[in-house]
């Protein structure tokens, strides 16, 4: 595997970091659905965060999108208490997603690292949804939302990231 080193000055990196983190909040706050769109864009940003966001801000990037989604529901009237139940697990799965990509890309191609990380994130969320469902805390629809949809939006987010990354690396 050929490795290419790209140098980014600190001012440019700070600019990109601010864009990624801001969009991580704004997209789920301003776009209330469908999950396929918002989830894909958020996953793309989480992946972009592995390249453009300082390590110390990964937790911020992992947390902001779900807070924005809750606020969107409160402000625009589509609030569901069920999302609140998932918040800590969404934060954990997003953080694990970011960190596993960073760890795995040292050992595998980025495409495989992202794919494996998507499945890990989806597993965490599906397992949480399954436990909540078994205890009758959430309706069955959350098994799909936190399972298959996570895989689909993660893969689609990865595809978009790879396209953007290819353009970025050519500049």
Region spans (language model):
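Membrane-embedded alpha-helical segments of multi-pass membrane proteins
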Residues: 37-49, 88-96, 123
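Residue-level signature of the transmembrane alpha-helical core
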Residues: 18, 22-25, 44, 63, ...
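Hydrophobic, membrane-facing alpha-helical anchors
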Residues: 34-49, 64-74, 145-146
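Residue-level recognition of membrane-helix boundary sites in multi-pass small-molecule transporters
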Residues: 56-60, 112
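Hydrophobic alpha-helical transmembrane segments
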Residues: 29-38, 59-67, 91-105
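Hydrophobic transmembrane alpha-helices
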Residues: 2-52, 56-57
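Membrane-embedded alpha-helical hairpins and interfacial helices in multi-pass inner-membrane proteins
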Residues: 33, 76-86, 93, 99, ...
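Aromatic-anchored segments of alpha-helical transmembrane domains
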Residues: 22-30, 65-76, 119-127
């Amino acid at each position: 595997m050929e490795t290419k080193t790209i140098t980014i000055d600190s001012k440019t990196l700070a600019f990109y970091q601010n864009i990624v983190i801001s969009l991580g909040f704004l997209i789920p706050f301003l776009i209330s659905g469908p999950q396929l769109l918002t989830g894909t864009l958020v996953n793309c940003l989480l992946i972009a965060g592995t390249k453009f966001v300082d390590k110390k801000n990964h937790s911020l990037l992992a947390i902001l999108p779900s807070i924005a989604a809750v606020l969107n529901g409160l402000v625009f009237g589509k609030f569901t208490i069920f999302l609140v139940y998932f918040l800590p697990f969404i934060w954990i799965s997003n953080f694990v997603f970011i960190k596993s990509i960073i760890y795995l890309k040292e050992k595998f191609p980025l495409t495989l690292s992202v794919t494996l990380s998507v499945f890990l994130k989806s597993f965490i969320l599906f397992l949480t949804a399954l436990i909540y469902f078994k205890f009758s805390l959430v309706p069955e629809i959350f098994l799909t939302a936190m399972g298959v949809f996570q895989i689909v939006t993660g893969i689609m987010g990865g595809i978009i990231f790879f396209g953007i990354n290819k353009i970025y690396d050519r500049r």
